[in-house]
Amino acid sequence: MPVNSFDDYYMSWKPDIKNATPPIYKALAEILENDIKSGKLKPGTKLPPQRELADFLDINLSTVSRSIKLVMEKGLLSSSIGSGTFVSSDADINTVILLENNNEKIIEMGAILPDVLSNKLLVSYMEQLVKEQGCEKYFQYSMPDDSKFYRETAVKWFNMNNLNVNNDENILFSAGGQNGITAVLASLFKSGDKIGTNKFIYPGLKTIAKMLGIQVIPIEEENNEITKEGLIYACKNEKIKGLYLIPDYSNPTTHSISDKGRRDIAEVAKSFDLIVIEDAINSMLKNEKSIPIAEYAKENTIYISSLSKTIAPGLRLSYIYSSRAYYEKIKTALYNINIAVSPLLVEMASRIINSRDLEKIISIRKKQIKDRNKIFNKYLSDYKVLGEEQCPFRWLILPEYFTGKSFELCAKKFGVKVYSSERFAVGGRKLINAVRIAVTSAKSNEEFEKGIKIIKNLLENNDEIDTLL
């Protein structure tokens, strides 16, 4: 029997396991998962202490702990040493944010897509490739790692991002950034491991971690930048194994890590032997390029640079720099996931990067981002918005009468797609009410301006919210 009486005692969750089928830890985990997914337990709800739950249910503490761990590995719970266990902020949100093409009337400002204008240049490269004698070889299995030309192209790309790579033997190729991150997590982490990151981060990391049973831990921040003290605390108390960061225009907060912050992260990584995954997805878009974290901690950092935001999203290719300590494991994971990346895409990317057209493509991208941000600022400069003129998305902090989720729903009802802060949240604490707005995804400047006007109208006419929802 329970030691204490719970008849008049408040608990945020009082599961009933009277009719549960053994093993009890699995049955309890299933009840907890169902209560979260059904909405009975809301995002941010703090669960009762595990000892309290064990007493209430009259079962062993270890049984409760095993149940909590199972649900945590599915990404539905988050915990912090000394703070307790919470229902994850994104537990009731779809974190898959790829473009949906099922409604042409919706103005796309959710998914981050570069313009299609410069794709015409890419088409000319493709046409030339398939007309060449012997082009059949690009449709065969091929290992780009074996090509010195491809490796040297990757080195050139890295050097353009201020990562000084002299040894082209540490280069790997993946079918896009998400593919590269998946390979790194699958090869260097195991179920139950913890990886630290920002309080709001790219949802793709969360979906991979959830699939692999890896717990994502939010690190203490100051002005959207991870603090050295917070990182040390997470290493000592949360026992994180690694760290995932987007150092330039972090998705979704738009923050770029300061040089001091990069040095601090590198210092802590070396001290605690952390695996740092540096996602350089936006680095090439910056006019003033910073020194990558990898430059300060090459032995601890895996640097992933995708071509999707700079050249084209359909060019599914990322260059990866890894120290020899991780190289073979990541290489094996990439082989198991892909066998190989497309030889056609690797050849095409190499030709573009080694041509004058690369600068032309990047210039087109940058100009469109700048032009769209001018339109954005024209209408929304009176609101709290993060993001500079070269950033391909903005982070709009909402007035208190909106949650991110409610604003996303309202905007969609008026024909504009944006993404709420709940989609990006890590952990179970109170959220900032915000939405991410992609500035380059609308089909034209006119369509983008129309979408921004709709957003401004929603912000100014909050008396219609209850009716809309």
Give the ranges of each region predicted by the language model:
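Short beta-strand "wing" residues that participate in macromolecule-binding interfaces
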Residues: S78-S79, V165-N166, V418
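Conserved core of the PLP fold type I
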Residues: Y138-F272, I277, S283-N300, K456, ...
